[in-house]
Amino acid sequence: MMENSTTEARNEATMHLDEMTVEEALITMNKEDQQVPLAVRKAIPQLTKVIKKTIAQYKKGGRLIYIGAGTSGRLGVLDAAECVPTFNTDPHEIIGIIAGGQHAMTMAVEGAEDHKKLAEEDLKNIDLTSKDVVIGIAASGKTPYVIGGLTFANTIGATTVSISCNEHAVISEIAQYPVEVKVGPEVLTGSTRLKSGTAQKLILNMISTITMVGVGKVYDNLMIDVKATNQKLIDRSVRIIQEICAITYDEAMALYQVSEHDVKVATVMGMCGISKEEATRRLLNNGDIVKRAIRDRQP
């Protein structure tokens, strides 16, 4: 008898997984995976509240902090790391914390998730403040490490969010903004790296992306604040300027170089026919929002 938890229950559709052909197993997994985005869709009302609050706190100087263990922790670290090149965020603005530290990204750290106090220490080490948003991620909804992190964050006055894949989760009782996504039993019983992990990844994609849209790091659907750390991203940066300003690639490259590789500044320069200094001033006066800076005609 498995425990009364959806993520630990046996999946009736895969009771004979070991007897299926490779193709049958693939078709079954694919069918199960199709349930995930539909389950996430049901959580949009809760996610809307989470993202609006996160945008507000970010604008006040708060940080977005993910905390979790195992797969959940790794997904948080991954999302935080990707925000740096995608949105040119400071590594200290969006942070992923995993039980057991960085070593746990590639190796299992035995027992790390079982200690509530460890999460408190990890949050103290980054000087958690009341401006921050702490998102606790746990498929089961009852991981002690995440419980400890959210509990401590509440005492600091930080905004707390929980993401779980079970209904009536323990962490939902602790967080100010609980999000529960019921994806059903896993293809492989209890292996929450599967449907639960997919759901968590989709949710983190939504939270970070739409938050960054809300703070002005996107123009239309373009990565206007992209940080070019390699040749591919340099080329993308120039093409973004080219696309928005409707100019040639070479003209866009010239703006990119004059702006000292700042896509936002280069775009405002190109759209308004102004100097780097004037473009910088307009962005500063308009909350770093490119469209507002372009419309700004004040001397």
Curated annotation (Swiss-Prot):
Pathway the protein acts in: Amino-sugar metabolism; N-acetylmuramate degradation
Oligomer and partners: Homodimer.
Entry's transmembrane regions: none
Gene3D superfamilies: 1.10.8.1080, Glucose-6-phosphate isomerase like protein, domain 1
InterPro entries tied to this protein: Etherase_MurQ, Glucokinase_regulatory_CS, MURQ/GCKR, Reg_chr_condens, SIS_dom, SIS_dom_sf
Additional free-text comment from the UniProt record: A lyase-type mechanism (elimination/hydration) is suggested for the cleavage of the lactyl ether bond of MurNAc 6-phosphate, with the formation of an alpha,beta-unsaturated aldehyde intermediate with (E)-stereochemistry, followed by the syn addition of water to give product.
Gene Ontology process terms (BP): amino sugar catabolic process; N-acetylmuramic acid catabolic process; peptidoglycan turnover
Role description: Specifically catalyzes the cleavage of the D-lactyl ether substituent of MurNAc 6-phosphate, producing GlcNAc 6-phosphate and D-lactate.
Entry similarity comment: Belongs to the GCKR-like family. MurNAc-6-P etherase subfamily.
Disulfide bridge partners, by residue number: none
Pfam families per the UniProt record, alphabetical: GKRP_SIS_N
Key words of the record: Carbohydrate metabolism, Lyase
Residues annotated as the enzyme's active site: 82 (proton donor), 113
Domain spans labelled SIS: 54-217
An annotated Gene Ontology molecular function: carbon-oxygen lyase activity
Catalysis: reaction(s): N-acetyl-D-muramate 6-phosphate + H2O = N-acetyl-D-glucosamine 6-phosphate + (R)-lactate
Official protein name in the record: N-acetylmuramic acid 6-phosphate etherase
Originating species: Staphylococcus aureus (strain NCTC 8325 / PS 47)
Enzyme Commission numbers on file: 4.2.1.126
NCBIfam families on file: N-acetylmuramic acid 6-phosphate etherase, PRK05441.1, PRK12570.1
Family annotation (SUPFAM superfamilies): SIS domain
